[in-house]
Amino acid sequence: MSLSKSKVKSKIKELNEKLKLYNHHYYNKNESLVSDEYYDAKLLELENIRDNFPEEYNQVFQKDFSKSVLEKVNHLDEQDVKLKKEKHQKLMLSLNKAYSFEDLERYTNRINTFVGNNHQYILQEKIDGVSISLYYENGILTKALTRGDGIYGENVTHNALNIKDIPKTINIKENIELRGEIFFSLKLFESLKNEFLDKQDGTKNKKWNTPRNKASGILKSLKTTDESSWLSCFIYEVVSPENFNLKTQKQLFDFLKIQGFNLPKFEFIENENLIENFITNFKFEDDQRDYEIDGLVIKLNDLSLYDLLGKTSKFFHHSIAYKFRKKFVMTKIEDIFVTVGRTGLITYNAKLQEVVLNGSKIKAATLHNYEYIKNIKINIGDKVYIEKAGEIIPRVVKLVSPKNDQNYFSPIEFCPSCKNKLSWSENMLNQFCLNPDCIEKKIQKLKYFVSKDGMEIQELGGKKIELFFAKGWVKKIEDIYNLKNNYDDLLKLENFQEHSVNVLLHKIEESKDVYTWKLIAALGIKNIGKKLAKSLVKIIFENDQKNLLSLLEFNYDELEKYDEFGSVKIESLKEFFANDENRNLIQFLDQNGFELKMEKEIIQSTKLENKTFLITGTLEKPRDFYKNLIIQNGGIISSSISKKLDYLIVGQNPGSKEKKAMELNIKIIDEEFLKKMLE
């Protein structure tokens, strides 16, 4: 469902304010409120909204784009900055980011387009630290500036002089500017953290929460501190390398080594085709590495091409940062709790110490069923690794320190809701509450019915279902459509005003005007999803059944002649519609405004007849616009890539589907080509 203009604008404002807050703390208070991954995810979300809703984006900022974090360069607050600010001799920009091999391919393709093919590259570790620029005059270190906002940096020379990894003198008499990263050794950080934590004041947790934050705090302290001797430094850039006859990155690194600087680990890559292989085999999570990295930097080896490739206001085009996504993150199980689903399925879950994984804050994760707990031997207090399964649902993967004993969480015997004894499935993997009167099962069924996967009654969310159930107003689906009888009671509730109650009741009434497949899907019939619900309604219409009661009268054995309906699915339908409670529900819905409705495919032309299409990436208009356009001209929308696909329509940031289409020799087109097909 597409967002309204007002909701799009609200989302833009919300994301912009959040990112402004994060920037303020990062640039002015030397602390990160969120992880890099979380920040990048929110920034990318705002960029996507800007690209997809340009009109709303322009209206929010009224064309004064300096108010947007996407356009704003200077994030330093005049009133907060106490260190002396100085202008960089050359812009100290950040790196553009790549999150996939497709992003990297676009980076190398751009280089090939502008300066030809067959280039060599340098891949170096991207240190998770504080960027620094060092100025040497007549061989003596005279100034050290942080990146700041890329235009102005803070003068931290007094503390940089105390960092052992930074040579105070070098054998270069010409003025030279070098850039790199200040960071904390992980072993030293943990050792010092344990030693000094108790001596800190009330801000101790902030000061020692991450190595980078602590390094930043030390480096930017107003007075010279001995603590700066704890810090380390890698240098990887020479500003204006042509002044020193440096023509390649490889020569530049050799030059820095000779001058006594430490360098991040790097690899020389002969051509772009080897980049993906190197990254695939690179150990991003290496226990032997004594510093934090958050990716790899890919740089064109030929320095003479850098100016030709140009820059944006935020980054240069000659280099890019490949940001790896962590597969796992370590945390601790604080508690184990159980939930009951709408079918009575028992799910075990872990309450976790909060961590961030791939841009998401995670406080809980699924443990699936008891068999899963037993196999991994999980218990409260254990340190575990978690991952985001399918990039959606966090789950516990394994213990940090495997056990040999039987010290793991015991299975529950009774339903946490109705207290009835639980039953095991035949294979002894899952537990179920079979009590038809279980309150939690009923609540979950109601929640599913009004959810996005069901009837999409947005104003009637899960919290309201719980409240109305507790009040006794909504015990079953029929009660939702009788909620208008509780109008006066609703007005007495806290935060329920006349307008909001009227909107709620209007949306409930409005939900009756729905295609029947959506109603069937909302009923939560076992083994029957949206696709089969659509097919069922189409078949019922073909059999000249014209009202909702047809669902009760239809001979479901006739479905045997349709390939998509196997015996298990047919049995599920027969069982559901034979149940007295369900039959009463259908009769109620039929008598209260629900009709048997089928989605009609409006065909404007047959120009795309029997041609299959799949859309990937961000297009000029919402995807639904193009999907409807294809269907209206006789085309078919596919849900996945296969050899049967005729066309892949590609927008910005297309992802892995584009590569898969190339491998299968599927024709790749853009939205302009689609429009030409319809002329």
From Swiss-Prot:
Annotated disulfide bonds: none
Superkingdom of origin organism: Bacteria
Residue ranges annotated for the BRCT domain, each copy included: 603-679
Binding-site positions, Zn(2+): 415, 418, 433, 438
EC number: 6.5.1.2
Molecular function (Gene Ontology), one example: metal ion binding
GO biological process: DNA repair; DNA replication
Obligatory cofactor(s): Mg(2+); Mn(2+)
Keywords recorded for this protein, A-Z: DNA damage, DNA repair, DNA replication, Ligase, Magnesium, Manganese, Metal-binding, NAD, Zinc
Binding-site positions, NAD(+): 36-40, 94-95, 147, 181, 299, 323
The reaction(s) this protein catalyses: NAD(+) + (deoxyribonucleotide)n-3'-hydroxyl + 5'-phospho-(deoxyribonucleotide)m = (deoxyribonucleotide)n+m + AMP + beta-nicotinamide D-nucleotide
Active site: residue positions: 126 (n6-amp-lysine intermediate)
Family as reported in the entry's similarity comment: Belongs to the NAD-dependent DNA ligase family. LigA subfamily.
HAMAP family for the chain: DNA_ligase_A
Function: DNA ligase that catalyzes the formation of phosphodiester linkages between 5'-phosphoryl and 3'-hydroxyl groups in double-stranded DNA using NAD as a coenzyme and as the energy source for the reaction. It is essential for DNA replication and repair of damaged DNA.
Name of the protein: DNA ligase
Source species of the chain: Mycoplasmopsis pulmonis (strain UAB CTIP)
Gene (UniProt): ligA
